[in-house]
C-alpha cells in the first residue's frame, strides 16, 4: 500500500528580500487646497502637506515642488516627463502644448517617445522631445511619411511633386525595384518614382 502522507520538502524556505518595496504616494485622508501669493498647495487634515512628491487627490495625480507648491506644465521626474494642466492635474492621452502634440501614457502619465499605436493608427513621437512627427521621419535605416494628422502613411504618397511608395506592411519607403500589384516600379535612392 502507498503511504498518503507526503514527505517533507528538504528545500529550505526562501529568505525574504531585505530591500523594502518603495512606499506608495500617500493618499490624503481629508484635506484642503490653499492658495497664497506663491501658488496652490494642499494641507492634510493633520496640518502636514506633500512636498517634492506626486500624490493622488480625488481622481487625479498632482506633483508638488520641494516647498509644497502644486506644479503645472512639464515636470521631469526619475528620467520621465509628465504634463500637468492649469488645474495641476496630471494629464494622459493626447496633449497639445504650443504648436506640438504629445502623448502621455494612460496608466502612468509618462510622455511616450518612438512609435505609438493608438487605436488602429501608428504615430511617431520624436525621441528627444516627444513631439508628434509630421512629414518625413527617419527611424533606423528606413524613411517613413507621417500625414499632417501625424498618422503613418502607406501606399502611394505624392510629396514635393514626386511620387513615393510606402510599404503597406511597415510604412517604410521603397527604394530600388519592386512589384506593386502586377507592375514593376523603380524608385531612386531618394525613394522617388521617375515614372
Question: Positions of the model-derived regions?
Answer:
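Extracellular adhesion/carbohydrate-binding repeat motifs centered on closely spaced tryptophans
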Residues: 1-195
